[in-house]
Amino acid sequence: ILGLSCVSAVVLTGCIDETLPTHQATDEQLSSSSKATEALLWAMPAFANNYKTVDGGDYDWGYGSLMHIRDVMTDEMVIIESGYDHYSAWEHNQYIGPNYLSTQFIWNYFWKFVQTTNNMIGAINPESASETQLGYLGAAYGYRAFIYLDMARMFEFLENDGTSPTNSSGNNVLNLTVPIVTEEVTEEAARNNP
């Protein structure tokens, strides 16, 4: 039995071939392929129309939905009551807060959009990039600036006479917006970003 076990161990084992993952691309693969970097470029405007990004709710249909949310929250749009409305939380300023999906949708959508731009920026080395790739890089920086500007509009705490600028953690958040997460920030650091 011992001899059979030894022969089986030698015959049935072998070297493992290392393969690259096929369900995702590495940073090296993205930066070395012109088609891959072009795909990252087109991912940015495509994300603006992304459907069911966060939770699959009927309001989860991309940037246009965020524009609609801002319109109904700021009385820029007449609200018609039909008894069935996917935007009622924002229209009535109800169920808005850290424990509600309506708030989390906006936050998560913006950060996934930032991640999409950071993927493009991180895939291009400006020192060795072609002229076309530098154009892609410029587009990514533009999209990221656009998203951060929108986040500032949505999340900056402004002085008012109804709500204290001191949050539940005891921090004064007057005139603060959101943390800046660039392509160089690690996931661990991003999760710890004040």
Model regions: which residues?
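Membrane-proximal, proline-rich intrinsically disordered regions
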Residues: 14-68, 127
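Short amphipathic alpha-helical interaction/hinge segments
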Residues: 19, 52, 152-159
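Sec-dependent bacterial lipoprotein signal peptides
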Residues: 1-13
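Acidic helix-start/capping segments at beta-turn-to-alpha-helix junctions
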Residues: 64-70, 136, 142-143, 165, ...
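Generic structural "secondary-structure junction" signal
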Residues: 18, 22, 32, 92, ...
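Conserved, well-structured interaction surfaces
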Residues: 82-157
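Hydrophobic-face positions in mid-chain alpha helices that act as interaction patches
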Residues: 53-74, 87-88, 177-178, 184-187
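Short coil/linker segments at helix-helix boundaries
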Residues: 154-194
